[in-house]
């Protein structure tokens, strides 16, 4: 058995296959909190960055000094990466599919005793074994200009054109419409959903202003009400007013007024039978995941299936 540092993984979590033993001199097993993290990718770096972020948030107090190396596809580019790693040794995460390119990086790290981890190997090996198909090993393949790419662009253009109540008379052309009071994360949530391929519109609820009839009559889109804890919403609005050098005690930010506004919004959602998502303690990604699930059920009732693009 390779000399794994069990303190790194625990008895129930052996290191991934192919992961080199961590040298005890690297300091990771001695409570090290700050370290150099090199992220190496043969494409845009989104995958390796997302996986690294998802892992790092599980460790409190860890502050990596991140070095990004994108579009690494040739020997010369790998040599520059290796030089950078030599200058700031630490931990290396990579997503490289070309065997020759990754071989250079792995050999250099092995020679210098630097831990070097391929994040996609377990997934690719599992898929290959299950499907009985060899991996094609084409870098950046997920970024080809295919139908998914153009669908994403189309969704982004639609969403930008239908932000904050614009062109709400065309709401029935949307996949998803978000409705909520001011500062309830409608626009950023719509943009995230658009990046997943959904045509989105959003409409702000303003006290004393009735809903447009086109929105109430819309049958095709999933209409979702967004709500937020009044205290949190009041604080956010006050911060917004401070940023704009405006009076913080305006009705817009007063707690009692905000509370009444939120209650009125909930009554509207209930009357129209719209599902409600409370975004108080949810990130944009978490709220969007809930909305996507609602949309999938919305389509199932019509005998359809949602096609969700990867993030």
UniProtKB/Swiss-Prot annotation:
Top-level taxon: Bacteria
One Gene Ontology molecular-function label: protein serine/threonine kinase activity
Keyword set includes Kinase: yes
Binding site for ADP: 180-187
Catalyzed reactions: N(tele)-phospho-L-histidyl/L-threonyl-[pyruvate, phosphate dikinase] + ADP = N(tele)-phospho-L-histidyl/O-phospho-L-threonyl-[pyruvate, phosphate dikinase] + AMP + H(+); N(tele)-phospho-L-histidyl/O-phospho-L-threonyl-[pyruvate, phosphate dikinase] + phosphate + H(+) = N(tele)-phospho-L-histidyl/L-threonyl-[pyruvate, phosphate dikinase] + diphosphate
Sorted UniProt keywords: Kinase, Nucleotide-binding, Serine/threonine-protein kinase, Transferase
Oxidoreductase listed as a keyword: no
The protein's role, per its UniProt record: Bifunctional serine/threonine kinase and phosphorylase involved in the regulation of the pyruvate, phosphate dikinase (PPDK) by catalyzing its phosphorylation/dephosphorylation.
Family annotation (PANTHER family): PYRUVATE, PHOSPHATE DIKINASE REGULATORY PROTEIN 1, CHLOROPLASTIC
This protein's name: Putative pyruvate, phosphate dikinase regulatory protein
UniProt lineage: Bacteria, Pseudomonadati, Pseudomonadota, Alphaproteobacteria, Rhodospirillales
């Amino acid at each position: 058995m390779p000399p794994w540092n069990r303190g790194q993984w625990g008895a129930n979590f052996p290191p991934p296959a192919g992961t080199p033993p961590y040298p005890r001199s690297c300091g990771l097993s001695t409570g090290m909190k700050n370290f150099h993290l090199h992220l190496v990718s043969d494409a845009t770096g989104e995958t390796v960055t997302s996986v690294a972020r998802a892992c790092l948030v599980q460790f409190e107090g860890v502050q990596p000094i991140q070095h990004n190396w994108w579009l690494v596809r040739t020997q010369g580019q790998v040599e520059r990466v290796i030089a950078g790693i030599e200058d700031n040794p630490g931990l290396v995460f990579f997503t490289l599919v070309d065997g020759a390119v990754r071989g250079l990086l792995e050999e250099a790290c092995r020679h210098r005793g630097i831990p070097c981890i391929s994040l996609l190997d377990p997934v690719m090996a599992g898929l290959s074994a299950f499907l009985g198909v060899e991996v094609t090993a084409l870098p950046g393949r997920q970024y080809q200009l295919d139908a998914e790419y153009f669908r994403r662009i189309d969704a982004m253009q639609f969403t930008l054109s239908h932000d904050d109540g614009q062109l709400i008379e065309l709401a029935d052309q949307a996949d998803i419409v978000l409705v909520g009071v001011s500062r309830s994360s409608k626009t950023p949530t719509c943009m995230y959903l658009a990046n997943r391929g959904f045509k989105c519109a959003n409409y702000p609820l303003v006290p004393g202003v009735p809903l447009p009839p086109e929105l109430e009559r819309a049958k095709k889109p999933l209409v979702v009400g967004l709500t937020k804890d009044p205290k949190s919403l009041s604080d956010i609005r006050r911060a917004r007013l401070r940023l704009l050098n405006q009076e913080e005690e305006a009705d817009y930010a007063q707690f009692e007024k905000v509370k009444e506004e939120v209650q009125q919004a909930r009554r509207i959602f209930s009357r129209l039978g719209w599902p409600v998502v409370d975004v108080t303690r949810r990130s944009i990604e978490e709220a969007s995941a809930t909305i996507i699930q609602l949309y999938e059920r919305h389509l199932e009732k019509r005998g359809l299936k949602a096609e969700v693009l990867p993030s």
